[in-house]
Amino acid sequence: MKILAAMSGGVDSSVAAARMVDAGHEVVGVHLALSAAPGTLRTGSRGCCSKEDAADARRVADMLGIPFYVWDFADRFKEDVIDDFVEAYAEGRTPNPCVKCNEKIKFAALADRAVALGFDAVATGHYARLQDGRLRRAVDADKDQSYVLGVLTPEQLRRAMFPVGDSPKPDIRAEAEQRGLLVANKPDSHDICFIPSGDTQAFLGARIGVRRGNVVDADGSVLATHAGVHEFTIGQRKGLGLVGPAADGRPRYVTSIDAETATVRVGTVEDLEIWEFGGEPVVWTSGRVPGQPIECQVQVRAHGSVVDAIVEPGAERIHVRLRTALRGVAPGQTVVLYRPDAEGDEVLGSAVITRD
């Protein structure tokens, strides 16, 4: 097969590319340039997609003896990931940019170009597994990335390969060391790659501006003012700007955000609990909408807790009823549905959470 190896410059994608070469495939490496302005993404020790990372990826490709290219997706990344991220926060939602990047960039824009150039599939360093077209959790539960891949359609999954999903992360590092790959001990990427400072609030404020509003309690009493709803997310406790402790002495958390009125409501930890929510749009990884309610498990954030639920399916929308209440569920987050079995949890589909 002719395989395009997406190489971030990290250890996982490097070993993934090496395994594709070992398997006898015709492999070409590509690094995605996602920033139009140099220095606006994290550097190699803190994240991905920097000039240093591109250089690391090129050196690994040279060691593997495969062609290597850098493809510029900066405009698509800004439009589909960064602008979407900013818009969501301005509307009081809490998005996951890694989910959006996989959906729109790595397995859409990149994969589309790969197919147009005659490649059969795109291989990445994601920790997940594909078995008979079914997306499953990785062997390494701590590194599992099936959550951020739960938005992929059947067509996208058919042209994807995850060569490291069957291995624990320590084994991947050991293999990289054994192969003599210079990235064997390179730190994992964390946080949001397009916010170099790590200050999400400042990043959003510079792009959204000031729209003052009130922080209120359950009965509508004003407790504080704020400069914009982008400063908050459901479940947030710190940085609320409250003038003093609540009468009962208990901490307060953000329980709802109304972007139209710029009102942020706070309450107790118990007020964060929810038992049901909606989700749209919906992706079913099999391409088929279940004909009846399904018993499954749901996860609402990367590496978050998993709870049992009953999901009423639909082609455009789902309704989730939880067996155990969850706290801090925010509109804009992605809910991923899993079916547990002996082969490893299977991803059934996903949706963007709505609270109505």
UniProtKB/Swiss-Prot annotation:
GO CC terms in record: cytoplasm
Biological process, per Gene Ontology: tRNA wobble position uridine thiolation
Chain positions covered by the region annotation Interaction with tRNA: 143-145
Residues under site feature: Interaction with tRNA: 126, 333
SUPFAM superfamilies: Adenine nucleotide alpha hydrolases-like (SSF52402)
Enzyme class per UniProt: transferase
Residues the record marks as active site: 101, 193
Main location per the UniProt record: cytoplasm
Catalytic activity line of the entry: S-sulfanyl-L-cysteinyl-[protein] + uridine(34) in tRNA + AH2 + ATP = 2-thiouridine(34) in tRNA + L-cysteinyl-[protein] + A + AMP + diphosphate + H(+)
UniProt subcellular location: Cytoplasm
Catalytic activity, EC: 2.8.1.13
Cysteine pairs bridged by disulfides in the record: 101-193
Pfam families named among the record's database cross-references: tRNA_Me_trans, tRNA_Me_trans_C, tRNA_Me_trans_M
Keyword annotations: ATP-binding, Cytoplasm, Disulfide bond, Nucleotide-binding, RNA-binding, Transferase, tRNA processing, tRNA-binding
Task performed by this protein: Catalyzes the 2-thiolation of uridine at the wobble position (U34) of tRNA, leading to the formation of s(2)U34.
Record's protein name: tRNA-specific 2-thiouridylase MnmA
Organism in which the protein naturally occurs: Mycobacteroides abscessus (strain ATCC 19977 / DSM 44196 / CCUG 20993 / CIP 104536 / JCM 13569 / NCTC 13031 / TMC 1543 / L948) (Mycobacterium abscessus)
